């Protein structure tokens, strides 16, 4: 995987691109990566006691073995494409917080190869909008936790020397109610108040 990432970085650098992304590599799915980044991992996978990578693939493809028998997360079409993404599950006990280092490790890996990249992460609005809620809580109940997590993400990238961060918000193409717009604006007002000089691209 590292060899493939290095080859891709070199090709993009040699092509003269102004903005080269990082964190665009995934072993399975970008939404699943974001779920693990934000600690949105159902207990049925955590309780298997697997290695981090095996736990990731249990969520992606299910697990049948000596440690248990669980189905994978549900899949849905990514908007109007033939790509399918893994649907994050959020229940009333989910503690949404920054819990993984993948985006930061890949940014540092690119720096070690002489490339200062623009990290790319699925944005908070799209993540909450596409998640499946199991219980009584809705996306609004996770406002504080998810904004805190993205502020932490920004802070870590500032410390690492990043200049740009790209937050992908494809859910903005959908018809949005007044409440949706207000929720989106509230998310980004809080986050952008704490960007510490980092340039944010949507």
Predicted regions and their residues:
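Domain-level signal for soluble alpha/beta catalytic cores
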Residues: 1-202
């Amino acid at each position: 995987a590292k060899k493939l990432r290095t080859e891709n970085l070199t090709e993009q650098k040699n092509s003269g691109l102004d903005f080269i992304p990082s964190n665009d590599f995934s072993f399975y799915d970008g939404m699943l990566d974001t779920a693990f980044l934000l600690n949105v991992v159902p207990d049925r996978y955590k309780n298997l006691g697997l290695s981090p990578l095996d736990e990731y693939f249990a969520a992606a493809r299910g697990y049948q073995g000596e440690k248990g028998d669980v189905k994978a997360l549900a899949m849905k079409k990514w908007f109007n494409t033939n790509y399918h993404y893994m649907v994050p599950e959020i229940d009333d006990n989910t503690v949404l917080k920054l819990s993984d280092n993948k985006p930061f490790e890949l940014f540092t890996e690119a720096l070690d190869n002489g490339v200062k990249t623009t990290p790319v992460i699925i944005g908070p609005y799209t993540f909450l909008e596409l998640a499946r809620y199991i219980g009584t809580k809705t996306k609004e109940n996770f406002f504080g936790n998810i904004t805190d997590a993205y502020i932490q993400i920004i802070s870590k990238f500032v410390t690492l020397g990043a200049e740009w961060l790209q937050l992908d918000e494809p859910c903005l193409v959908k018809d949005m109610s007044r409440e949706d717009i207000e929720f989106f604006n509230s998310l980004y007002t809080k986050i952008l108040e704490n960007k510490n000089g980092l340039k944010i691209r949507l």
